[in-house]
Structures are given as structure tokens and as C-alpha cells.
């Protein structure tokens, strides 16, 4: 049984949002790094850093909140494609999340990208997760 680092990342972000924690540390894999960069570009997180701890490289994600009540910018993160059931889509069938308010993160032949880029480039791929 292998480690599902994407599921771990999603769970850490979800739990941190529930506890209103400022930062989250996750294992730095290429997939996690790419997804975190997308979240930073789309404005869901405030900051992204990498740090070395002994032999492990960790991503330190600073979550973004709004207002005095600290409402998280990431309302929901939902993993779609899982180890037991992969979900693929061509560019025409990529779903829209909340009418375009959320994003779909895909793994394609051109790297990990969001749904808008995939539609523009007319490429499909594996649907990793929804974020809104």
C-alpha cells in the first residue's frame, strides 16, 4: 500500500481551515508543489515556502482567511481521482465548479493545470480535485 500524498495534502488543508490554523506543512512532492503553486496563483493561499527537515523536504503553506471571523478562502477541497478509481476527461467534458467560481485541477501531458487552461489548450487529463 503506497502513500497518497495528494489525499494527505487535501486533508491537511481541510483540517487547518476547520481549526483556522495559519500554516500547514506537507511533504514536498512534484504533484503537491504544482498544486500549491496553482492555489497561490488563483489566490486561495497567501504564501508558499519550502524547507528542509533532516532528509525530508516540506512545503509550508500559509492559508488565506478573510475578515475578523477568519473565514477561509478555500471553502471545500474535494479529491476526485483516487488510487482505486482514476477519473479522466477530455477538454469538452471538464466540469465547471460553481459556474466557474471554483477550479478543477487536472494532471495532463503538459503538467498539472487548471480547467480554464485545459479548455484553452484543448487537452484533457486526469481530474485530480475541485477547489472552491
Swiss-Prot record:
Gene3D superfamilies named among the record's database cross-references: 3.30.1370.30, 3.30.1490.10
Molecular functions per Gene Ontology: rRNA binding; structural constituent of ribosome
Alphabetical UniProt keywords: Chloroplast, Plastid, Ribonucleoprotein, Ribosomal protein, RNA-binding, rRNA-binding
Compartments, as annotated in UniProt: Plastid, Chloroplast
Signal peptide feature range: none
Any GO BP: translation
Disulphide-bridged cysteine pairs: none
Database matches in PANTHER family: 40S RIBOSOMAL PROTEIN S15A (PTHR11758)
Family assignment from sequence similarity: Belongs to the universal ribosomal protein uS8 family.
Assembly: Part of the 30S ribosomal subunit.
Record-given protein name: Small ribosomal subunit protein uS8c
Gene name for this UniProt entry: rps8
Amino acid at each position: 500500500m503506497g502513500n497518497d500524498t495528494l489525499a494527505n495534502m487535501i486533508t491537511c488543508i481541510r483540517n487547518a481551515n476547520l481549526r483556522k490554523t495559519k500554516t500547514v506543512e506537507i511533504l514536498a512532492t512534484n504533484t503537491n508543489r504544482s498544486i500549491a503553486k496553482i492555489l497561490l496563483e488563483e489566490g486561495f493561499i497567501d504564501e508558499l515556502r519550502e524547507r528542509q527537515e533532516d532528509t525530508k523536504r516540506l512545503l509550508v503553506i500559509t492559508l488565506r482567511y478573510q475578515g475578523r471571523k477568519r473565514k477561509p478562502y478555500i471553502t471545500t477541497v474535494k479529491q476526485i481521482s483516487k488510487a482505486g478509481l482514476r477519473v479522466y476527461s477530455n477538454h469538452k467534458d471538464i466540469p465547471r465548479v460553481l459556474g466557474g467560481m471554483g477550479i478543477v485541477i487536472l494532471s495532463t501531458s503538459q503538467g498539472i493545470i487548471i480547467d480554464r487552461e485545459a479548455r484553452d489548450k484543448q487537452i484533457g487529463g486526469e481530474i485530480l480535485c475541485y477547489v472552491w
